[in-house]
Amino acid sequence: MKGVKAEDVHHFLLNTEDLRHRRVSRMVEEVQKILLQVTSDISNRDSRFHCISNAGIHSDSLKVLSPSQFLVTVPLRGLSGFRQKKTRRWRYYSPSGTQLLAPAMEPEKLHQWLEIEQFQKSTPHWHDNDVNIKGDLVPARIIHVFLEHLYRAITFCSLSDKVNVLESYGPSIRLNVETSEQMVEVELVPVVEVPGYWPKKSQWPRFFKRWPLRERVQCVKSFGFDLLARSNYHWQLSFLRGERLLLEAMDDDGGCRMKCYRAVRQMKEDVWCPGNHPVINSQHLQMIFLWASERHPSAKAWKDLGRCFLRIVRRLQKCARQRFLRHYFVRRANLLKYADTAQLDALADKLSRFLQNPSLGQGASSVC
């Protein structure tokens, strides 16, 4: 197998990275400005929803999944003092509130039920029937309430020419937001923030692992986790703040992990997995890098940029071929469980051909 020289990766990043950063930063700034208006109006109408922060590309409320796909979380207010407790096992209601003869589906590995009693403090509106069924906070109902406010806010803020709500087949809110660069698809997700608490579903860190350091682990856990409203009944566990903290400190030992990550991401976006709805996004890549950092904890393993680049490409190919990628914090969850298998197979084939004759020239030429 041919190799890739470190200077080739450096040259590739020099020709592509700055352009991408400037484009994405402009789009993030414009999207945040628009959504700040919209969510501020929603917050004024319904105090249960907080407006998003406007902190640029490093905002905790916005994640760039790809240049054409953003994830924006909308914090929920009036819920505090979360505690883990054993919830009742079966639910016999639909999201609309009608009685079912058979119980609703149990949560998957990365999901859980959420009861109002799990919070030591909750404002009276969270007990209302528009979001609560038999003591459960129901994501589908919260999304429905938020969506109604969203339509009114877009009209009130005179943003109908900039923002278009997309038709959705599940409990999610997706928008097309027009920017000066291109149209961006934004998923708006209500989120319950749980700072200072670590969920039992996350058996992390694993025993006898040298990465990350104990101090970093304690810092990550102090940020807690989030619960995202992305399904009918269940709340999805999310660790975006912890992931960001680990990524930011990844090269404190002088390694080349983040340069390697940016090179793989650029090739993925330009050559291996282009388009508006890539089967692999930045969230998947970050998981791959977190696992690789745990498996190769020494600084020596991350000195040769060319070798590290190919190591990650091989790992990405393996994930695509096997259609399996463990979540870093909840390792029993497969992040590719519902991914398009045809797209994963096509990606694996592209990566196989690339590894037979690796060249970064194709990625650089597609950007120019």
UniProtKB/Swiss-Prot annotation:
Matches recorded under InterPro entries: Mab-21-like_nuc_Trfase, Mab-21_HhH/H2TH-like, MAB21L/cGLR
Transmembrane segments annotated in the record for this chain: none
Annotated signal sequence range: none
Pfam families listed in its UniProt record: Mab-21 (PF03281), Mab-21_C (PF20266)
UniProt-listed PANTHER family: CELL FATE DETERMINING PROTEIN MAB21-RELATED, PROTEIN MAB-21-LIKE 3
Sequence similarity: Belongs to the mab-21 family.
Record's protein name: Protein mab-21-like 3
Taxonomic lineage from the root: Eukaryota, Metazoa, Chordata, Craniata, Vertebrata
